[in-house]
Structures are given as C-alpha cells and as structure tokens.
Amino acid sequence: MTSSNLIKQLQERGLVAQVTDEDALAERLAQGPISLYCGFDPTADSLHLGHLVPLLCLKRFQLAGHRPVALVGGATGMIGDPSFKASERKLNTEDTVNEWVEKIRHQVSPFLDFDCGENSAIAANNYDWFGGMNVLTFLRDIGKHFSVNQMINKEAVKQRLNRDDSGISFTEFSYNLLQAYDFACLNKNHGVALQIGGSDQWGNITSGIDLTRRLHQQQVYGLTVPLITKADGTKFGKTEGGAVWLDPKKTSPYKFYQFWINTADADVYRFLKFFTFMSLEEINALEEEDKNSGKAPRAQYVLAENVTGMVHGPEGLAAAKRITDSLFSGDLHDMTEADFAQLAQDGMPTVELNRDADLQQALVNAELVPSRGQARTMIGSNAVAINGEKQADPEYVFTDADRLFGRYTLLRRGKKHYCLISWL
C-alpha cells in the first residue's frame, strides 16, 4: 500500500468503518509519514481473532511508511472497557494483569518491525503514565475537560444505563477518560496523530481527539475498522469450543488452520481482503479462477496458509498442514509426537487405556461403539482403522507397533469418527 491514497485503499478492502474528517486525514497522510497507535487491553492471557484486523491495520500503515505504536493497557486493563458490554467486567489482580501485559506484548511484536529506521514500531504501556498519577491530578487535569452530559449520551454507555438489570460503576464509567488521555499522552511523547481501533471504540477515540485538542492544541484523527461478521449472521472468530486465540497453547496451529479452511464460500474472498496482504488483483483473480475451475475453491487453503503462517510462523503452518494431510490420507507416518499432542489439546476425543486393553474394549471405552458386540460387528465389516490402517480381526490385540511414540494410537470408525488413545 502506498501512503498517498492509503485511506482509499483500506476502504476498497472494506477495512474502514468510520473515520474522522476523512479529507483532512487523507491530506495529512499525503504530506508524509505520521505516527499512529492502537491499544490492546490485557483482559485475557492472549489476543484472539477479533484483535487481528486492527493489529494488521497497524502493519499496513507501517508498510506504507508510517510509524506504529502498539499500546498495551497495563492500566486500562485493570479497569475494563464497558463499551457495548452487557455487564460489569471482572476486575483482575495487578499481578495477573502484569503477566498478561507481557504475554500480549510478545504476541504483538512479530507483526511489526521494531528496527527499520525512522518508522520503527514503538511498544508502550499506559501504566507508565497512570501508575504514578494521583486522584487529584486525574480529576483536575483530565476530568475537568469532560462533560458528564456528553459521556452518558455516548452509545456505548447509554446501552448500559438503559438496562434494568445492570447499570455502570464509576470505575467503568471513567474508562473513557483513561483511553482519551492515552491519545493525548502519546501525542505529546511520540507525536501520535491517529488512533485506530475496532468500531466499538469510536466513542473512546473521539474523546481522545477532543482531549488532545484541549490539552495540546493538536489536530488528530481517528479511524475504526468494522466488526467482522459472517454471511450467515453468526459471530466471527468463535467455534463450538469458544474463541479462536492467537496463543498456540490455547488454540493449536492445526485448529487455527482448520478454522480458516472451514470458511464459507460466501465469506472467503472478503476475509482474504481483511486478513492477508494479497493485492485486490490477486484476490479477484483467485475468485475468478475458483468460479471457472469446476472444482472445490482454492481460496480457503490460500487464506488458511496466509493467516496461519503469519500468526504461527513456518513451523506452525507446516505442522497444521502435516496433521491435516495425515488425517485426510490416513497415513500417520509423517506426524510428530507434538502433532498428536495438538490433537489432544484441540479436543479430539481422547481416552486413557491400560496396555492390556484389546481393540473391542478400546472402541467401547472410546465411545465409538456402545458394546463389545457392536465393536465385533464394526471390525468385521472393515469399518475400523488403527493409525489409518484397516483392521478386520475382531480379536485383535494391540502391539507396541501400534503405540506411536510409545504412547499414542489413533482409532477411526467409519470416515469421520476419531478417538486418540493415550496409553498408560
């Protein structure tokens, strides 16, 4: 992306929900590089897919020559943003928040270049300016610039105030002031002139613009990226098991890869615009190719490879593809011990068995069949595979060769029903 028409390029990809004074911002970007920031509050020990679009937006600006600031909210994370939340957030301990700050800082770092000259990225933590601030300073220097009338009319707060079952605490009500001061502080210390964030952050961003103008007489700007939705109306970034996390210990590279592989045809080309750095020409050409091929579309695999490689690196992508190919072909010889551990982590049905269990008992314990009699029938009808190889002997007893890495055996009934045995 080039700097001169960056806003237009983002709009063409569907990446702009709202922008303050679009013409003035476009003119400012055309004049030369600016500094911009996006904040990430440590409300969990990992970022999830919902954070990926604004994070990649920071990267898009850096690739166009601008300087990104990744702000981790060590202070705001102890308060909790009430924006469009139905109820009060649970307050986490300072130790927990500090631990999560470090984890999120490490997650953000690979997406940005912190050593590329004048537009090298900056990592910041708002606890650095809020940690030592006393309440009188907060009220006198920040609070006096805010009208409560305007604050309660912001849509994000109004929704909470209108709920009969829950109001809003002063703690969460004050969050807006904290985020606003972040913008003013980063403007003073790093010349930050633009804040980006999710569309739910619009009220906080405009407050920061107003406060920066009052405190520093600077014109600054805000831009929000859209809330990602799926064509069928269901939530994006959720599976039956919950959120899709960027931390491989919470969502393995294989499960992450499979999430993208399962993208609906109605969504995949739009998601390529949101989550990859492919040009629009490349995406349009891929869509045309898929339409004319008469085969299953290639786009899901392109999307899965791009995003998994970006988040989990070459090794994570290789493992995800290796597991996928092995389960599809039934040939498990290329799988590593860590690959089997990923399957267990991802929620593949797993059962622990003593080493004297036979195949019939294993099928029953694995809940692949209801009884030993049914197990005999399934085995005899060639419907059971051990580590990808069919086994037709109803009296079969496992051998050491079946215990891959001395501990794992993958049972399959039919084509889709799996269970991973972990041998005791």
Swiss-Prot record:
<feature type="short sequence motif" description="'KMSKS' region">
    <location>
        <begin position="235"/>
        <end position="239"/>
    </location>
</feature>
<dbReference type="GO" id="GO:0005829">
    <property type="term" value="C:cytosol"/>
</dbReference>
<keyword id="KW-0030">Aminoacyl-tRNA synthetase</keyword>
<keyword id="KW-0067">ATP-binding</keyword>
<dbReference type="InterPro" id="IPR002942">
    <property type="entry name" value="S4_RNA-bd"/>
</dbReference>
<dbReference type="InterPro" id="IPR054608">
    <property type="entry name" value="SYY-like_C"/>
</dbReference>
<dbReference type="GO" id="GO:0043039">
    <property type="term" value="P:tRNA aminoacylation"/>
</dbReference>
<keyword id="KW-0648">Protein biosynthesis</keyword>
<dbReference type="Pfam" id="PF00579">
    <property type="entry name" value="tRNA-synt_1b"/>
</dbReference>
<dbReference type="InterPro" id="IPR024107">
    <property type="entry name" value="Tyr-tRNA-ligase_bac_1"/>
</dbReference>
<protein>
    <recommendedName>
        <fullName>Tyrosine--tRNA ligase</fullName>
        <ecNumber>6.1.1.1</ecNumber>
    </recommendedName>
</protein>
<dbReference type="InterPro" id="IPR036986">
    <property type="entry name" value="S4_RNA-bd_sf"/>
</dbReference>
<dbReference type="GO" id="GO:0004831">
    <property type="term" value="F:tyrosine-tRNA ligase activity"/>
</dbReference>
<dbReference type="Pfam" id="PF22421">
    <property type="entry name" value="SYY_C-terminal"/>
</dbReference>
<feature type="binding site">
    <location>
        <position position="37"/>
    </location>
    <ligand>
        <name>L-tyrosine</name>
    </ligand>
</feature>
<keyword id="KW-0963">Cytoplasm</keyword>
<dbReference type="InterPro" id="IPR001412">
    <property type="entry name" value="aa-tRNA-synth_I_CS"/>
</dbReference>
<dbReference type="GO" id="GO:0005524">
    <property type="term" value="F:ATP binding"/>
</dbReference>
<feature type="short sequence motif" description="'HIGH' region">
    <location>
        <begin position="42"/>
        <end position="51"/>
    </location>
</feature>
<keyword id="KW-0694">RNA-binding</keyword>
<keyword id="KW-0436">Ligase</keyword>
<feature type="domain" description="S4 RNA-binding">
    <location>
        <begin position="357"/>
        <end position="414"/>
    </location>
</feature>
<dbReference type="GO" id="GO:0006437">
    <property type="term" value="P:tyrosyl-tRNA aminoacylation"/>
</dbReference>
<comment type="function">
    <text>Catalyzes the attachment of tyrosine to tRNA(Tyr) in a two-step reaction: tyrosine is first activated by ATP to form Tyr-AMP and then transferred to the acceptor end of tRNA(Tyr).</text>
</comment>
<dbReference type="GO" id="GO:0003723">
    <property type="term" value="F:RNA binding"/>
</dbReference>
<dbReference type="InterPro" id="IPR024088">
    <property type="entry name" value="Tyr-tRNA-ligase_bac-type"/>
</dbReference>
<dbReference type="InterPro" id="IPR002307">
    <property type="entry name" value="Tyr-tRNA-ligase"/>
</dbReference>
<comment type="subunit">
    <text>Homodimer.</text>
</comment>
<dbReference type="InterPro" id="IPR002305">
    <property type="entry name" value="aa-tRNA-synth_Ic"/>
</dbReference>
<feature type="binding site">
    <location>
        <position position="175"/>
    </location>
    <ligand>
        <name>L-tyrosine</name>
    </ligand>
</feature>
<feature type="binding site">
    <location>
        <position position="238"/>
    </location>
    <ligand>
        <name>ATP</name>
    </ligand>
</feature>
<comment type="similarity">
    <text>Belongs to the class-I aminoacyl-tRNA synthetase family. TyrS type 1 subfamily.</text>
</comment>
<keyword id="KW-0547">Nucleotide-binding</keyword>
<dbReference type="InterPro" id="IPR014729">
    <property type="entry name" value="Rossmann-like_a/b/a_fold"/>
</dbReference>
<feature type="binding site">
    <location>
        <position position="179"/>
    </location>
    <ligand>
        <name>L-tyrosine</name>
    </ligand>
</feature>
